[in-house]
């Protein structure tokens, strides 16, 4: 049997250890709630049993690293960022855990020429710094993994923070929600462009099986994100793991807003994972969305669970 491994992405939803708060002084888990959140997260790791997993919304890295270590995910990396001093935390990071050695880590740096070409303000900053890592997967190859959490669709500023029209009420009810969300969409699209160019340059310099995974806060078919899968050159194309899977079921939502489901969490794979590519090294057997907690609401559990479904791709080596 050929070697196999799995890759997952998991938005944890405000993983912050008390007495720290997330975004507001009232958002603090008590000891029982925090234990339940850790237990729920641990149980998902046990169920999925990923070999490589990227996380989003990490405020408290040490307890998450300990949960991963207990499940054999002993190799760990956290996106760089300045440590917040206030007890109210507002800057979550992404992280990576693996059963396989992490050879090196780096950040995705915005390309100055692309920033200029897109007419963006300089210096350009990601809303949440992506994490780039090189891992060694025994029996396969080194693999490049980029963990992302792109800008959310929420308005980029609060009502009254940036008045754009003279009518204050109209500004807050209409201008801010519409134009603020548009600003967020532009930021998200710019982040996708920076990722696309960074990976192209990496593949040109050092071609490796590569993965971009995480919470993209949007559908890959949207005009803003479709460029991540763009390019006519097969060697530089990324494809959704679900589209590459040999066993394809229905495309399950990974997030719900009310009764409306969306696929926001994705695993994008380079051509080496495409069984139809001439130089393919691996194939995607199946993609699983772990969404039971979203489909069967439990009001008591909801705050301790995640508002996203983890996504896992099972991969078989073909060499």
Segments from the language model and where they lie:
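Metal-dependent phosphoester-hydrolase catalytic domains
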Residues: 1, 106-107, 119, 124-127, ...
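N-terminal, active-site-proximal structural segment of metallo-dependent hydrolase catalytic domains
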Residues: 1-75, 80-93, 169-172, 192-196, ...
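Active-site-proximal beta-strand elements of phosphoester/diester hydrolases
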Residues: 4-17, 142-151, 173-181
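Hydrophobic pocket-lining residues within nucleotide cofactor-binding pockets
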Residues: 12-15, 58, 102, 150, ...
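Short, solvent-exposed loop/turn elements at domain surfaces
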Residues: 15-20, 154-156, 276-277
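Structured beta-strand-rich core segments of catalytic domains in phosphoester-bond hydrolases
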Residues: 54, 58-155
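Charged, glycine/proline-rich intrinsically disordered loops and linkers
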Residues: 159-179
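A long, amphipathic alpha-helix that forms part
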Residues: 178-206
């Amino acid at each position: 049997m050929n070697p196999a491994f799995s890759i997952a992405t998991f938005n944890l939803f405000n993983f912050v250890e008390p007495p720290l708060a997330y975004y507001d002084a009232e958002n603090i888990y008590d000891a029982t709630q925090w234990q339940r959140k850790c237990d729920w997260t641990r149980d998902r790791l046990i169920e999925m049993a990923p070999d490589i997993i990227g996380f989003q919304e990490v405020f408290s890295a040490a307890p998450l690293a300990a949960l991963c270590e207990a499940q054999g995910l002993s190799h760990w990396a956290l996106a760089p960022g300045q440590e917040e001093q206030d007890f109210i935390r507002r800057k979550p990071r992404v992280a990576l855990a693996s059963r396989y050695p992490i050879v090196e880590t780096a950040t995705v740096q915005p390309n100055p020429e692309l920033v200029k070409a897109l007419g963006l303000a300089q210096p350009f900053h990601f809303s949440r710094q992506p994490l780039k890592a090189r891992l060694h997967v025994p029996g396969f190859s080194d693999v490049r993994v980029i963990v992302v959490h792109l800008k959310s669709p929420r308005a980029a500023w609060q009502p009254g923070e940036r008045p754009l029209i003279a009518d204050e009420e109209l500004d807050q009810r209409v201008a801010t929600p519409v134009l603020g969300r548009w600003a967020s969409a532009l930021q998200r699209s710019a982040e996708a462009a920076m990722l696309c160019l960074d990976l192209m340059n990496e593949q040109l310099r050092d071609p490796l099986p590569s993965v971009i995974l995480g919470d993209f806060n949007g559908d890959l078919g949207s005009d803003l994100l479709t460029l991540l899968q763009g390019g006519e050159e097969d060697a530089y194309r990324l494809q959704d793991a679900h589209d590459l899977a040999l066993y394809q079921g229905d495309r399950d939502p990974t997030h719900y807003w009310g009764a409306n489901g969306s696929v926001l969490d994705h695993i994008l794979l380079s051509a080496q994972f495409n069984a139809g590519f001439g130089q393919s090294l691996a194939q995607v057997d199946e993609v699983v969305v772990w969404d039971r907690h979203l489909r069967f609401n439990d009001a008591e559990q909801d705050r301790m669970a995640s508002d996203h479904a983890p996504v896992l791709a099972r991969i078989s080596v073909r060499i």
